């Protein structure tokens, strides 16, 4: 089979997957195409392909009894995932062609993704760089952090006073999050708290 025929098959398969997710994952009507639904349909379709490779990688680690690195950080700032995953899978042209067939542009859909609010500082960027480096060097590594509801906040000045507003990045849930309610671990924080009043009554 030629490259053009293979490309056409990949585009057709992706189009069908996007519409399937719009209908069966989101419970929405694929017609007429709507950017919000098709953005999520594309995310879930990319995730399907990503998970297949992820599971293959996991099996190879277990089969070779590889040592693994576990990186614990209170913050991660990976940036938007969709285009990063599309490029890592080598399917950017396939995605562009599939999305254009629905009368949309890939760049428009990519812009609909919220930045994950998993932190708000240089520590988070550094942690994400470590994870990228481990992946590039084929080092089995896992990042562990906190799934914040409000990991980032916005600041504004109103009448001369600073005001903060939360960034609810999970308001529409995230297509990249696997919620595993059957796995629960107790995390203990040791120490004690003491309550007292000083001489000023504070």
Stretches with model-predicted labels:
Residues 1-202:
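A conserved ligand/cofactor-binding region detector
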